[in-house]
Structures are given as C-alpha cells and as structure tokens.
Amino acid sequence: MASKSWLNFLTFLCGSAIGFFLCSQLLNILLQEQADVQPNMLHNDPHARHSDDSGHNHLKGQMDFNADSSQHKDENTDVAENLYQKVKVLCWVMTSPQNLEKKAKHVKATWAQRCNKVLFMSSEENKDFPTVGLETKEGREQLYWKTIKAFQYVHDHYLEDADWFMKADDDTYVILDNLRWLLSKYNPEQPIYFGRRFKPYVKQGYMSGGAGYVLSKEALRRFVDAFKTEKCTHSSSIEDLALGRCMEIIKVEAGDSRDPTGKETFHPFVPEHHLIKGYLPKTFWYWNYNYYPPVEGPGCCSDIAVSFHYVDSTTMYELEYLVYHLRPYGYLYRYQPALPENILKEINQVNKKEDTKIKLGNP
C-alpha cells in the first residue's frame, strides 16, 4: 500500500515538473513574439542608455543613399560646408564587439560620415572595422569606464583635430549639420557641454547619455585633467550622471541646447515616442527628469533637432532619407535660424566671389 502511494506521489511530481516546463517554454515563446512585434523601448531605468540588443531583426547589409546623387546636383550646401570647416566636431561612438555588424556599421554608413573625425570605441580593438580598443570589459557597469578612457584617448591623440567632441551610442542618430549650427554660437575654449538636460541629483543638471552629449575643447581638457588630479573619480557606473557630477565639480557649464523657440534638440527616444501624445505614460520617469518642462506631441521637437536615441538599423536609414532626401516640391525652407555674424559674413564673402567668377565666365 505504501509503495503504491509513493508511486502515485512520484507520478504527480513528474507530471507537475513536465507541466511547469512546458508552460515556461510556451510563455517564453509568447514573450519573444511580443518583443519582436513591439520592441521594448520604454526602459524603466532612466540610466539604461546603452543596450547590446533590443531583440530587433537587424539589417545585414549597409545601404548607400548617396549612390544616386543626380537629384542633389543643384543643391546649395554653402552654409553647411562653411560650418563643417568652422565648427569641427569629432564624434566617438560607444559600441561593442557584438554590435559592430548589428548597429555600428549602420552608424558608419549614415550620420557618422558628416563628422570631421569619427572613432568607434569598443572594449577590443578591431583593425578591420576599425575600432579603438579601450581594454575594458563589456556590460552596463563598464559604461563610465569606457567613457573616461574614450575621452582620455581622444584628448591624447586628437585634441587639436577638432573644436568639439561628441559622445554617442551605436543606436543614436545625429544630425551633424544642426549640431554645428547650435555650437557655432559658442567658443570651444569656453568650458561648456550640451545634450538633453536632466535635473535630478546634480544642481546644474546633467546630459542624457543616450541622446548624446558634446564637450567643448576646454571641457575635454578639464575632464581629462580632473582624473589625473583626482578631482573626479569613477564614482558610479551610471555614465551620464557620473560625468555630470564631474562637470559640475570642474566648473564646466551645462549648456542650454534648445532652439530659439524653446524646443528641444536632443531627444532620448525615437521620434514617435516624442511626437505621439500618450506614447509615454505619465508615470514614466522621463516626465520628472527633464530640466526644462517637456512638451508632448508636435511641439516636442525642434525643426533643427540634433539627435534621437534607441534607433535600430532600419530606422537609422529611414531618418537618413527623411532628413537629407525627402522634400516637398515648391517650398523654400520655412525656418532658418540666424547664424553668428562672423560666420554669416564669411559665407557672404564666398558667395560674392562665386558670383564674380560666374559673371567673368570663370569655371
């Protein structure tokens, strides 16, 4: 009798175990399907800036939107080209060995081409891509170490090659021409940095890591020197907050990156999360973190936006097309914010010389 009861008990345990296993497998399949249909972009942690993989299907090959340049042959890029020469921006992109094919190569094929200099920073060197090996481990807890070492590397090797130094993730899309306009009003010898300004924990605020941030040459000097003199230390693994605290200690100003109408230019999410009302629930951390009152809907974003975050490989090319190729026929651009007088004067002088050449019949 006892052996029969024991056998029944074992049968029950085995059945329960098998049932639990099958249920867990089914649940995993359902959750994976849900992730593929609606990727999890709403991170509950405001400092979860850099993810290795969001579950998306990544494009395998690069795309070249400049292959057919015939439609752009009459395009006047004088102002952008002048700013390219006058406001030199070095971009360094935080990536990892496993993200080179998934993400970094699409950054390389799109917006990174407009940097005056671009570097891809990883834990390991890759001479083919290429990447700079920072000799760190991978993982979220290493982000600030990678940031410190990346800025130190840039300072030691490229300080005189640029005026401004931008950090971006490999899932950030940056419109460099708009960034140069923003920076053109400032002196790179001024200790200042720009990005999407958040307010908690730092009196002057700090810049969102995911939306990217840009340091002036003097800010970079002070940041690197602060670790040599131990004014700043690796106080936290939370990259953007720790960097913001250091900037306040070394008296680097947290600049206002809004446009003349008060709209934000750096964005910590993809466009639809800012543009569509109700996409971000009011209980979401984002609403309490902004230094300036956030706007939901069409008023959220400047016409001269600088960056968006959590951009997958497909969206990277969509933004490239929408920003640099799509135009409504018959319209002159409606919003052209003013340039600094010195740059505007130089552009006008160049245009006068070109007009003179044309009148004289010179090529």
From Swiss-Prot:
Binding site for UDP: 94, 138-140, 146, 169, 309-310
Pathway(s) where this gene product acts: Protein modification; protein glycosylation
Signal peptide boundaries: none
Residue numbers carrying Phosphoserine: 235
Binding residue positions for Mn(2+): 169, 171, 309
InterPro entries hit by this protein: C1GALT1/C1GALT1_chp1 (IPR026050), Fringe-like_glycosylTrfase (IPR003378)
Main location: membrane
One example of a Gene Ontology biological process annotation: intestinal epithelial cell development
Topology, Cytoplasmic side: 2-6
Residues reported to bind a glycoprotein: 285
A single GO cellular-component term on record: membrane
Residue pairs linked by disulfide bridges in the UniProt entry: 91-115, 232-246, 300-301
Lumenal side stretches: 30-363
Keywords, comma-separated and alphabetical: Angiogenesis, Developmental protein, Differentiation, Disulfide bond, Glycosyltransferase, Manganese, Membrane, Metal-binding, Nucleotide-binding, Phosphoprotein, Signal-anchor, Transferase, Transmembrane, Transmembrane helix
Start and end residues of each stretch annotated as Disordered: 41-72
Reaction catalysed by this enzyme: an N-acetyl-alpha-D-galactosaminyl derivative + UDP-alpha-D-galactose = a beta-D-galactosyl-(1->3)-N-acetyl-alpha-D-galactosaminyl derivative + UDP + H(+); a 3-O-[N-acetyl-alpha-D-galactosaminyl]-L-threonyl-[protein] + UDP-alpha-D-galactose = a 3-O-[beta-D-galactosyl-(1->3)-N-acetyl-alpha-D-galactosaminyl]-L-threonyl-[protein] + UDP + H(+); a 3-O-[N-acetyl-alpha-D-galactosaminyl]-L-seryl-[protein] + UDP-alpha-D-galactose = a 3-O-[beta-D-galactosyl-(1->3)-N-acetyl-alpha-D-galactosaminyl]-L-seryl-[protein] + UDP + H(+)
The EC number(s) this enzyme carries: 2.4.1.122
Subcellular compartments: Membrane
Gene3D superfamilies cross-referenced by the UniProt entry: 3.90.550.50
Transmembrane feature ranges: 7-29
Oligomeric and partner information: Homodimer; disulfide-linked. Interacts with the C1GALT1C1 chaperone; required for galactosyltransferase activity.
Function: Glycosyltransferase that generates the core 1 O-glycan Gal-beta1-3GalNAc-alpha1-Ser/Thr (T antigen), which is a precursor for many extended O-glycans in glycoproteins. Plays a central role in many processes, such as angiogenesis, thrombopoiesis and kidney homeostasis development.
Protein's UniProt name: Glycoprotein-N-acetylgalactosamine 3-beta-galactosyltransferase 1
